[in-house]
């Protein structure tokens, strides 16, 4: 047994992690790092393409660039520290580092959830009111949508970080997770945190179910509009417009609701760790692939970029 188990740690916490040093876990760690690399490169590339190509300077792609920025920050919040601890054999994280992880994680997950909900409204306007789309989704509205998503997430993250980090923590301070996940951290508090946990649950309900209700309402209206279309080509275009967003929504909300909206007696640390890997690493990797591989405009921008690089290298 490692020496840190028999010591108390007053300046920070110990992260028990998700991987041991068995052969199977080494393979899984390699897979997670490969996924992390793809997520990093994919989101950076998508942001770059949207910024560089004038044809992608539309509301939908502006929202997509913000989503990619959130995903990029999300994978960089927890995975590098997890990898550093695993490779070095150290399991510690400083008190300040733990607080930063909590604040960033809550902020980014909350902001992304709200943005995905408001992106559904954008799809609704594009399909149900195409003639009024440039007016209803002008630059000011787009900035308000993304700004409100970031603002709600930042406020939520700051409040929860300050409250959680002001609780007294006892004993060995071993967090049964691969990052400073708030609910795992609260189990180590020396005081009763049940009231705050109820507040967290209420925040999760708002930050997840409120945008999810916008998504359901938007797609209900979209479905009504699509059913009234008589052209097969119009059907295909409408479904293609929505399919990428629906896939991203299913991945993100499925994992987030599984963790944060389950009754407490159904929670298991091992399940939470796997679900956290899913939407902190896998979803950020899949989002740029979903939105680019199934989108002609993004693929066209990528081909033009590659052609420019090839021509430049020949000269």
Curated annotation (Swiss-Prot):
It is found in: Cell membrane. Residues 51-58, 122-140, 221-237, 294-315 are cytoplasmic. Its main location: membrane. Glycans are attached at residue 6. One of its GO terms (cellular component) is plasma membrane. Residues 1-26, 81-101, 160-196, 261-273 are extracellular. Belongs to the G-protein coupled receptor 1 family. This is Olfactory receptor 2V2. It comes from Homo sapiens.
């Amino acid at each position: 047994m490692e020496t840190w188990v028999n010591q108390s740690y007053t300046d920070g916490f110990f992260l028990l992690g998700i991987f041991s040093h068995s052969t199977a876990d080494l393979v899984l760690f390699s897979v997670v790092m490969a996924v992390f690399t793809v997520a990093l490169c994919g989101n950076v590339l998508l942001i770059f393409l949207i910024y560089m190509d004038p044809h992608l300077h539309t509301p939908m792609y502006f929202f997509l660039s913000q989503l990619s920025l959130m995903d990029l920050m999300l994978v960089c919040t927890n995975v590098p520290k997890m990898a550093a601890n695993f490779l070095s054999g150290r399991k510690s994280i400083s008190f300040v580092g733990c607080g930063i992880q909590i604040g960033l994680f809550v902020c980014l997950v909350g902001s992304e959830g709200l943005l995905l909900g408001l992106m559904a409204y954008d799809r609704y306007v594009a399909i149900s009111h195409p003639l009024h789309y440039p007016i209803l989704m002008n630059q000011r509205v787009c900035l308000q949508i993304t700004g409100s998503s970031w603002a709600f997430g930042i406020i939520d993250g700051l409040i929860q970080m300050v409250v959680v980090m002001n609780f007294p923590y006892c004993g060995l301070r071993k967090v049964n997770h691969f990052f400073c996940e708030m609910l795992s951290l609260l189990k180590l508090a020396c005081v009763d945190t049940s009231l705050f946990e109820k507040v967290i649950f209420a925040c999760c309900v708002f930050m997840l179910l409120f945008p999810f209700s916008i998504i359901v309402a938007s797609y209900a209206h979209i479905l009504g509009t699509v059913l009234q279309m008589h052209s097969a080509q119009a059907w295909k275009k409408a479904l293609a417009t929505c399919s990428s967003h629906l896939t991203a929504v299913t991945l993100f909300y499925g994992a987030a609701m599984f963790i944060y909206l389950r009754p407490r007696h159904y929670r298991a640390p091992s399940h939470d760790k796997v679900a956290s890997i899913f939407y902190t690493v896998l979803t950020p990797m899949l989002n740029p692939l979903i939105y680019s591989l199934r989108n002609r405009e993004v693929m066209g921008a990528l081909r033009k970029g590659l052609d420019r690089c090839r021509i430049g290298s020949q000269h």
